[in-house]
Amino acid sequence: MWGDRRISELVEPVVAALGYELVGVERLSSVGKGALLRIYIDTPSGITIDDCERASHQISALLDVEELMASAYTLEISSPGLNRPLFTEEHFKRFTGVEASITLSKPLNGRREFKGLLRGIRGDRVVILVAGEEFELPLEGIKKARLVPEC
């Protein structure tokens, strides 16, 4: 899982105890506004505002006790939504056959952006079919990945 691994490892048991799946964690910073910590949760039947509020109270208390955030931050609990972020190898396996957009940290063959059909996992690489050409992208090199909603 990329994103913030330390925070993910800390909040996953809390999220699971509430009956949710931790989809992933994103830590975003904005100059002058502090950090935004976005935590995605889900269940097979989806997530409601009440679910997000319930998780927010538990996670906020935990983060304050553990003092993982060095400065002021805003905590946002969210469902993954239609353009679901993909964080783990399991996510790429689960959504094989679905269109996704992947951004790499470093270019591969001169490009960082790939949008196409997920073909699964080979070893430690995500396989994606882009305009008839298959690419194998290193899992550890993925900066951001999301499903592309169907129109």
From Swiss-Prot:
Transmembrane segments: none annotated. GO terms for biological process: ribosomal small subunit assembly; translation. InterPro entries: Ribosome_maturation_RimP, RimP_C, RimP_C_sf, RimP_N, RimP_N_sf. Required for maturation of 30S ribosomal subunits. This is Ribosome maturation factor RimP. PANTHER family: RIBOSOME MATURATION FACTOR RIMP. Belongs to the RimP family. One of its GO terms (cellular component) is cytosol. The keyword Repressor does not apply. It is found in: Cytoplasm. It holds the Pfam family DUF150_C. Keywords: Cytoplasm, Ribosome biogenesis. It comes from the Bacteria.
